[in-house]
């Protein structure tokens, strides 16, 4: 199974069911070349602030995701775990688009890579933004493998 193709097909069906969401779904999923770009676009749209624009955040996240080769596999395993274990999650695209637990975890994965590459200040920036936006506070030094589900996520704190 190619999860990216599956996600794109799901989103096309979702657009048929909810045409008013077409611009949103096109921007974040269908216009993206791959899963990494899509996740980075979603995170950038949520994490932007006065300190960093969404374009700059997307640029940072893409750079980090491409430098840490295991991140895409971890994200795929997280998405699959959500779909397989959360009865409310009917589509692979749902965690990417709508679940702040996944979005917080995806932000942590970027922060963790930054932390491991001695970019502690930027890692802490992303940790802080994830805490403010998603209610998920995961220390960038924490070790979390792929295939994790943080359901609902409000008030989750995971230390170093």
Label each region the model flagged.
Residues 131-160:
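Structural signal for interior beta-strand "rungs" in well-ordered beta-sheet cores
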Residues 1-129:
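Terminal amphipathic alpha-helical/low-complexity segments used for targeting or macromolecular assembly
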